[in-house]
Amino acid sequence: MGILYSEPICQAAYQNDLGQVWRWAKESNHYVDVQDSFNGDTPLICACRRGHLRIVSFLLRRNADVNLKNLKERTCLHYAVKKRFTFFDYLLIILLMPVLLIGYFLMVSKTKQNETLVRMLLNAGVEVNATDCDGYTALHYACQMKNQTLIPLLLEAHADPMIKNKHGESSLDIAQRLKFSQIALMLKRAS
């Protein structure tokens, strides 16, 4: 289930197997930035796709290049911002919500984990305004997802709310189109 990678370190990063990631990185540091032959994902991108903080932290300590792009022209930051709850997460939240708000705490925990992931990447120097093959920046994705936690982080890191994607929309345009007035206000103040 999920993605199958041709590079073992990418598969290990995707599956949260720190032992295997460590083994490959120890064998040769070039594996830290190896790109999968199918979609160009690096181990860092693979770990960010799934929100695996320990793997991301390990790869950043090994000086993984945070600005490498895959074949969709996306960096690890694009995936960190796009990280959503899995079906299993939603199922647990729904089932546990009535039980002493455990579901709520699970949701808050997952949101904090995502925020931590994005902070780690920003602190490592990821290019905050990198665009993917459709011209989307991480800020575009955060606006689409109405992520009021990540947008201030991205703006603080100098994300440009006026960059337009291939559809001619800026992050501000997206927020206005989706009627996210608080986000639009944040973006207007930043521009």
From Swiss-Prot:
Keywords: ANK repeat, Repeat. InterPro entries: Ankyrin_rpt, Ankyrin_rpt-contain_sf, ANR22. SMART domains: ANK (SM00248). ANK repeats lie at residues 39-68, 72-100, 101-130, 134-163. Transmembrane segments: none annotated. Pfam families: Ank_2 (PF12796). This is Ankyrin repeat domain-containing protein 22. The lineage of its organism: Eukaryota, Metazoa, Chordata, Craniata, Vertebrata.
